[in-house]
Structure formats: C-alpha cells, structure tokens
Amino acid sequence: MSRFLRGLTILWVVFRYGLDELVLSSFEHPWMRRARAVLTLGRRLDKPRGQRLREALEELGPIFVKFGQVLSTRSDLMPPDVAEELARLQDRVPPFDSQIAVDTIERAFRKKLDQIFVSFEREPVASASIAQVHFAVISDRNGVQRDVAVKVLRPGMKTVIDKDLALMHMMARWVERLSADGKRLKPRQVVAEFDNYLHDELDLIREASNAAQLRRNMEGLDLVLIPEVYWDFCRSDVMVMQRMTGVPISQVERLREAGVDIPKLARDGVTIFFTQVFRDGFFHADMHPGNIMVSLEPETFGRYISLDFGIVGTLTEYDKEYLAQNFTAFFRRDYKRVAELHIESGWVPPSTRVDELEAAIRAVCEPYFDRPLAEISLGMVLMRLFQTSRRFQVEIQPQLVLLQKTLLNIEGLGRQLDPNLDLWSTAKPFLEKWMLDQMGPQRLWRELLAEAPRYAKLIPELPRLIHRRLTRNSGEHDELLKELLQQQKLTNRLLQAIVSAGIGFVIALILLQLVVRLRWY
C-alpha cells in the first residue's frame, strides 16, 4: 500500500511540474498530440525544463536529489541545459536525532558509547541524505588519543532506498517503452548504475577502503592530505577517520590573508587530479568545494585536504590511452585522428563514416582555438566530444563521463582561485610522461622484469624436463628427442642473441624515446 501511495505522489509531482509533457512530446501520433494538449491545459510551463526537473526532484526527497546529481554527471546522455540545472541540486537534509546516532553506534559495536570513545560530541557537524558526521576522541591500540570524525548512516535508509529504487526501475521501463528517446537515453541502464551507486554508499567500509587507497597513493605527493582510517572503529554503518582541520577552499580571501599562495594552490589542484588519473588510474570523483579544505598548520601549510570518498573513479590503461591521445590530437587539431580513436575504441557502430564523424568533431573543437590556450577548458572539450558522439550512437564508458565531470569541477575550482590558470600547461607533462612510458623503454623494461622470474625458473629446468620425459618413454619417441634437443639448441641461440643484441636494442629504444619527444608537437 505504501508503495502505491508513493507512486501516486511521484505521478502527481511529475504532472504538476509538467514532466509528463516532456515524455508525451516524443510521440507524433495525432491522438497523442491531442492528449498532450488536454493534460497540459491550465498549467504554467513557462519555466525551463531543466529547472522544472530540478524542482520536482527536490520535492520528491533526498533519494531523487541524489539521482539528479548522478544524472548531472551523464553529459553524454543529458541535454546540456538539463545537466547544468541538475548540477545545482544540493543534498540539504536536516540532521537526525543524535540519540539515534548513538544507538546505531552501540548496536554496531555491541558496546556502550563510553566503552568505544573517550569522548563523543552529540551535536552533528554535517548531515546529508545518507549519513551525518560527529566529532569524537578515541584511544588507539597503542593507547594514544586521537581526534576523529565519526560518520553514521541514517537508520532505515536501505528500506527507503529499496522502495524508491523499485519505483524508479518501473518508471524507467515505461519511459523506455513509450518515449521515442527512451532507448537513446537508456533509463534502465542509468537507474541500474544509480542502484549500484546508492547501495555502495550504504556500505561505509567501501568508502573507508577508497580513502585508504587514495591515502596510500598520495603518500609521496606533498600537496594533499587524506585522513587516516581507523579500521578498528569501522563497521558497515559507522566509519571513523582522522579529524582534519583547515579552511574551506571557497574562502579565498581568508586563505590569501593567511599567506597561502593562491595561484600555486590552483596549479596544485590540477597536479593532484592528473597524478591520480594518469599515474594511479584511481581518482577522487567528488572534488567540489564542499569536500576540500586547505591546511594552515605550519608543517602542512597550503596543502589540500580531501574529504568524503564515497565516489571514486577507476581507469584502465586503455582509458588513459584514449584520454591522452584525444587531448594531444585535439591540440594538434588532428580531428581525423580523434574520429579514428572513437572508432578504434569499438564504441561507434561499424557503419559510421570516419569523414562524417571527423566533420562533426571539427565543428565542435575548432571554435576553441579562437581563444588563448589558457582559456581552453579540457572538461568542456570532453563534454562537447561526448555530446557529438551521442549523435553517432557512441557508447561512452561511464568512468570517462565521471572523469569529465570531475575535470570540470577541478577546472572551475582552479579558475575560481586563479582566473589565469593555464590548465593545458599543467596537464601536458602528465600526458607527455604517460605517452613516453607507454612507448619508451620503461614499459618494455617493466614487462621484462615482470616475466623474468618465470623464465629464470623455466630455462634451468629444461634439461631435467627433457630427461624425465625421455626416461618415461624410452625407445618410443626418438623423433620427440630430436625435436626437444633441437628446441634446446634454438633456445640457447636465442639467449645468446638476446644478450649480444641487448646494447643495440637499448640504444634503439633511447632513440625511439627521443623521436617521441620530438613528435609531441
């Protein structure tokens, strides 16, 4: 019954904000046009469609707000005006009663609160639709007291989420059947991704693992601080991390008055992001100003502080190659190569003509070169490429769309700090190093080192293996003996050839690296 009532509520909100008109407008049958005219009679639909959708999602509650936030990252699927409006959605939810948070913690640990924490602040410092945060003090396994932040899941969230998701899945099926744009927008796929995303957020162990991975990756980079996870105090619905203190990055004047080098801070943000992308293939994908502070402590002055690790992105070597080659081809204005990269990726239907895709990409990219290099937005370039690709039914991978959205956030943040930030100059060394690593001797050397133990063990055992085989089948396999002995001779010759040619091969690889550097432009 409750699901039925919730469904009626959703339908009423959809009707009141004119969102049904967006679906019905896809139909061209005369009777559907008449139905649309009747249904929209007397309603004010003067607001832009994106604004109406945003306001409807806000009225439907936090789960739908989160859904809108996820949709805003799918610039490959959503029209630009709708994606831009959905990006304005804010996860504003009042905190739940602190006693409920205490009960959740005690239930998770099966202990009283004073047996878990040295002290616990009952007043939450932050709240969102999924969880809220309290400050506390713990005593670690060495007896050292630590200031921590405790994230506690809202109770009953799984039940609420499952009910709304069931309705979303049902609506997605209907939209895909009834709307002419349904198959292109892939509502069932989008809702399925959102389903996975929300259930991942319900497991705080996963978020803690993301934080631990980023902290480990960033240890050698003195530009960013990632809070330490205290695993002894983590459960699926409670996460305890190091308490971080700093100034929100949006408070630029306060940072400037404190002596922070603002232009350097802008460059450092880009450096952090591209290090995570091209070196680690694992990046913080929720780097908006609310999740970033700047340290003013003497030993870590001017460093970024990253918070909230519920959303991360992972990239394969193929994804990184796609990005690096697309960016370099774009700045060379080699639009044919950009089109070829899309086709080589296998995301484009086989019937796509390269010249047509090239012409469409040229129309998108060429206007960017009328402005200074420092004003070119790599995030916008990717977004426009994805939007152009949509016309050709290109299947863009979700992780690349997530990266594009994060890149836009990084660029916006960087240029808010320093309007003269040249993103390309900062990004270029990372692209160049990655390309050289892929084409130069470093990659070959890494692969040789990876395979060396296996071959080092196999080669000395070859005579023994031959002898064992022959003694088991004495007199029966003369031809096999000849073949194995011949193979051993060939192996010895091959090893000698590798050793004798090694120096020349290394020299050739060094020359190749120099050629790659010269061809960068």
From Swiss-Prot:
Superkingdom is Bacteria
The subcellular location is: Cell inner membrane
Domain (Protein kinase) ranges: 119-497
Taking the record's annotation, the residue ranges forming a coiled coil are none
The EC number of this protein is 2.7.-.-
For this UniProt entry, which segments traverse the membrane? 496-516
- What are the GO MF terms of this UniProt record? ATP binding; protein kinase activity
For the protein in the UniProt heading, the enzyme class is transferase
Active site per UniProt? 286
Binding-site residues, ATP = 125-133, 151
Q: Which UniProt keywords apply?
A: ATP-binding, Cell inner membrane, Cell membrane, Kinase, Membrane, Nucleotide-binding, Transferase, Transmembrane, Transmembrane helix, Ubiquinone biosynthesis
List, in alphabetical order, the GO biological process terms annotated in this UniProt record: regulation of ubiquinone biosynthetic process; ubiquinone biosynthetic process
Q: Name one GO cellular component term.
A: plasma membrane
The pathway this protein participates in, as annotated, is: Cofactor biosynthesis; ubiquinone biosynthesis [regulation]
- UniProt-listed Pfam families: ABC1 (PF03109)
Describe its membrane topology: Single-pass membrane protein
Similarity comment: family membership:
Belongs to the ABC1 family. UbiB subfamily.
Q: What does this protein do?
A: Is probably a protein kinase regulator of UbiI activity which is involved in aerobic coenzyme Q (ubiquinone) biosynthesis.
Q: This protein is called what?
A: Probable protein kinase UbiB
Q: Which organism is it from?
A: Delftia acidovorans (strain DSM 14801 / SPH-1)
